[in-house]
């Protein structure tokens, strides 16, 4: 199951507790989690509108039942553990967690945590030679 990231993916849920969330459909102007693909993983955020409960993690999308499992919590309002969400509507969206990000700094140099598995080709700029 590959890790898939897509732009403008936002759904809502009324699921309570700390288990798998049932997705209620895309918000107007956004894509649904179906673009992630059945059985694929993605980075997600669950947040209560106007509230203090939130969670960022890695989850697996399942098209039958349109659910997102909460497999790994990367950060949360519950000291990095699963959040037990109460009643009400929560937003669920695809995100790109800061601690997983690799980006170019203001000088165009790659920054962030860079790790590879298997074969990798790295091209670098060398300054001061």
Model-derived segments and spans:
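Acidic surface patches and DE-rich sequence motifs
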Residues: 48, 62, 105
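Glycine-rich, low-complexity segments
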Residues: 1-30, 65, 73-129
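Ser/Thr/Gly-rich low-complexity blocks that favor extended beta-strand/coil architectures
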Residues: 33-58
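Elongated alpha-helical scaffolds
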Residues: 53-69
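Generic short beta-strand segments
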Residues: 46, 70-73
